[in-house]
Amino acid sequence: MKLGYAKNAHQLHFILAFNQNKEKSKGGTYYYDGAQPYKNMQTLWYHYAAQASNFDVSLLFMNLGLETGDAETETSRTRYLQTFGTYVTYQPESGNWLPVQAAFYYQTGKNKNAQSVSAFMASVKAAYAIDKQWSVSLGYDYLSGSDGEGDKFKAFDPLYGTHHKFYGAMDYFYASAWQGVAPGLQDAQLGVNFKTSKQVSMQLNYHYFATAAKLDDVKKGLGSEMDYQLDWNVMKDVKLSAGYSIMRGTKSMDVVKGGDHKRWQDWGWVSVNINPRILFVKW
């Protein structure tokens, strides 16, 4: 359920959610099984965006209930994890700077393993338009990790983020599981965008990955990834996209993700997006 309020530059959303396994005739269990379901969730989101201001600001608070238990004995317990923080964009008034983006989020409470959590993530990205065709961007993401020491679990969980949009197009991180560790992630990015015409654009992005936490006998550097993407607006409502990515990992990548970093790792793809407007009614 979502309740919303909007007036002028202000938006406020309040979201409530509750899940129960439909196949159970009794009880209220919704056991965590490796995907990322939740038993219940409460979220408060506020956004401020004034046309006269160069700032857009979002504030988020989420309380997430994750249920674990024993299906045979039908005993369960719900642990609550809180995530809160802000996302800000700023448009410089002078020059060819594109909007600067920054975010910070903190997690506390308990995870599904009943561990006390103290974790955070931070990110910043800036872009500059050289001319009407060329632009460059620079960014950095930091998601805290856990080294196994202390009484707090320090690895930030991005939960329901659009993982394919971040941390490289090959989805090495967070879209797939770690190899029995939770080292966090550092992602330093450098990108170049080129518009050949109004219909065609290309982008090339470089990522350098490293762990956030220091693990025993493992260096932080994980490797580098290069992502290329071509977008072509063929006609109204039809878009063709294609891309190619390569990853060059290190020995540390073998430890945290498995596999063999010496093997060639690449990925190519082509997609056609057809998005026609079938029916439009204006009251």
Predicted segments, located by residue:
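C-terminal structured "cap/appendage" subdomains that terminate the fold
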Residues: Y228-K251
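Signature for the C-terminal beta-barrel architecture of outer-membrane proteins
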Residues: M1-G150, L190, K195, Y208-A210, ...
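C-terminal structural cap/anchor segments
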Residues: S137-M226
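Flexible, solvent-exposed loop segments that connect beta-strands
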Residues: E72-E74, D216-D217, D254-D260
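Outer-membrane beta-barrel "beta-signal"
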Residues: R263-W283
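A glycine-biased, small/acidic residue-tolerant capping/turn segment at secondary-structure junctions
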Residues: D151-K154, T250-D260
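Extracytoplasmic loops and strand-loop junctions of Gram-negative outer membrane beta-barrel proteins
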Residues: G27-Y31, D70-E72, T108, A169-A177, ...
